């Protein structure tokens, strides 16, 4: 997976890093990265790139982003003040083996109520990573909910990458 611009931009799965959803070559340009909107694209942000291999836990990384945005929220507008807190709480629950089946859809609902409804762009920046993580890596969220005993180990994908875990537990 690849985050082409810091924590506030949507993460792309491996299949969308080099090619767009239409099969065109993806360049590291604003236009190419935005191809397909946030459903299949992303954007350049701060100039910082984050690259994940299959041992990285997308849920944990999304939770870390949510913690950051919750901490940074000034609290002036309700969607950001309350929404970022809820994103952090629900992601913590999933990452720590206490997730429920409905939590993934709850995250989707929360992020959709934050995006476009805040005074400043921090709310959008908080919602986009969550939306992209669920859109592209829902199977990893479902794994966390289905196998809580396995994800309680902080290094759950270091020793056994998720790509291998997924095929062995299907």
Language model features: what each stretch is:
Residues 1-170:
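Redox cofactor-anchoring modules in respiratory/redox and cofactor-processing assemblies
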């Amino acid at each position: 997976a690849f985050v082409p611009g810091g924590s506030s931009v949507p993460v792309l799965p491996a299949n969308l890093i080099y090619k767009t959803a239409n099969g065109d070559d993806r360049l590291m340009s604003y236009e190419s990265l935005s191809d397909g909107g946030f459903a299949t694209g992303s954007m350049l942000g701060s100039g910082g790139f984050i690259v994940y291999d299959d041992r990285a836990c997308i849920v944990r990384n999304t939770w870390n982003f949510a913690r950051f945005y919750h901490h940074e929220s000034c609290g002036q507008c309700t969607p950001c003040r309350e929404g970022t807190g809820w994103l952090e709480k629900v992601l913590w629950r999933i990452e720590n083996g206490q997730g429920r089946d409905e939590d993934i859809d709850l995250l989707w609902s929360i992020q959709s109520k934050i995006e476009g409804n805040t005074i400043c762009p921090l709310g959008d920046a908080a919602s986009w990573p969550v939306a992209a993580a669920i859109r592209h890596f829902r199977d990893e969220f479902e794994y966390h909910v289905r196998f809580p005993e396995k994800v309680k180990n902080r290094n759950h994908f270091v020793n056994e990458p998720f790509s291998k875990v997924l095929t062995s537990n299907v």
